[in-house]
């Protein structure tokens, strides 16, 4: 599986199931300057908080923007409620479980945490308390969910200059990040077994 961060809460997943490539785009958006790249044509487009300001995508992807359980091209997608009308996505593909917390501002209640506990990979917004989780709250939630890999999203970048820098979250989490990568390429066998890894992705495009 390939995982890339495209700024804000937007993430691109490239996976293969039964010899078929499946491209997934989460929270594609229209930046204030420039255009969202159209070279990526997803089969699935997921939105955590509605489609306002959604990017224009080529082809006609299957869109998920409501709660429920979906199976598309042998990829399982569970859309579960978060706080303040935010949707949390739990995605199962290639034997991996990925949880994307969406545009979360407030951590879910303990009962809701059980639905997303123990993912292989956690994509968590860490940028601020206005649009996303505060770094301190994000670190506490990441620890509570016990993922094997943590990938912070929605921190400061050229399309989100008002968000807090990634350094604030790293300091709160207390984990030394792996070297910054342009994308994460991972298989089930590559997951850490005894520790949690923090991986910081460069914004793509």
Pin down the residues of each PLM region.
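Conserved beta-strand hairpin/beta-sheet module of binuclear metal-dependent hydrolase folds
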Residues: 1-33, 85-102, 121
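Active-site-proximal loop/helix segments of hydrolase catalytic cores
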Residues: 83-145
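Active-site environment of divalent metal-dependent phosphoester hydrolases
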Residues: 12, 31-35, 50-56, 106-108, ...
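Binuclear metal-ion centers of metallo-dependent hydrolases, dominated by the metallo-beta-lactamase
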Residues: 3-9, 84, 145, 149-205
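Active-site metal-binding motif and surrounding structural segment of the metallo-beta-lactamase
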Residues: 25, 29-69, 114-123, 127
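Portal/gating segments that form or line small-molecule/metal binding sites
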Residues: 55-99
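Active-site metal-binding loops of divalent metal-dependent hydrolases
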Residues: 28-30, 50, 82, 101-105, ...
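Divalent metal-coordination and catalytic microenvironments
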Residues: 13, 45, 77, 103, ...
């Amino acid at each position: 599986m390939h995982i890339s961060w495209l700024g804000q809460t937007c993430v691109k997943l490239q996976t293969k199931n039964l010899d078929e490539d499946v491209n997934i785009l989460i929270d594609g958006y229209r930046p204030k300057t420039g255009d969202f790249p159209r070279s990526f044509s997803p089969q699935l487009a997921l939105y955590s908080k509605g489609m306002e300001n959604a990017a224009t995508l080529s082809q006609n992807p299957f869109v998920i923007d409501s709660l429920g359980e979906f199976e598309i091209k042998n990829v399982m997608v569970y859309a579960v409620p978060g706080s303040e009308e935010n949707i949390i996505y739990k995605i199962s593909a290639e034997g991996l479980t990925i949880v994307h917390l969406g545009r979360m501002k407030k951590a879910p209640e303990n009962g809701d945490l059980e639905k997303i506990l123990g993912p292989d990979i956690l994509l968590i917004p860490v940028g601020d308390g206005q649009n996303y989780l505060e770094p301190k709250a994000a670190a506490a939630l990441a620890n509570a969910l016990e993922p094997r890999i943590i990938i912070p999203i929605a921190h400061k970048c050229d399309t989100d200059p008002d968000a807090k820098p990634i350094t604030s979250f790293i300091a709160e989490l207390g984990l030394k990040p792996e070297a910054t990568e342009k994308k994460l390429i991972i298989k089930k066998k590559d997951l850490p077994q005894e520790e949690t890894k923090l991986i910081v992705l460069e914004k793509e495009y």
